[in-house]
Amino acid sequence: AECQYRGFESARKYIRQILNNFSFATPGTTYEVSPDYGMFVQAWNVSGYNIPLIHYVFGVDPMAYKKEINIKTDIPEDWEYAKLDNLLVGNNQLSIDYQKSGQQKSFVISCTENGWNLHFTIPVNCKSIKINGKEIPANSGSIDLTGIKNTIELI
């Protein structure tokens, strides 16, 4: 809810709180938070960091029944690198590799299956956009990606 209403920056402190209890009661994993002060089963904490990272930071909004994935990233400005690897969406696996160097942001978006429609929302403050090495108008709003692997460069 914090990500949805106030953004990821506001939610970061809660994610850190969850991760700070790593191996506290359950070796090799985070301590499950519940009203009775803990459970061995992981059920709730995963939603405390997976949903914010996948849905809000990487901006993945899948519609597997249509073989469609909308991507609207909101990666924090202080992150120089982030990677989402092999996210299962229907019979497909989506990977997003993000790198930032100065003002340039680069995304490599890949899938394991052909025939899926990926829609990438361009941030409003872009001056230059290249898709697979070809420049496109910076006022595109959203672009449709085809194929197994696509590279997006934003300035």
Where are these regions (language model features)?
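Non-catalytic C-terminal accessory modules of carbohydrate-active enzymes
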Residues: 1-155
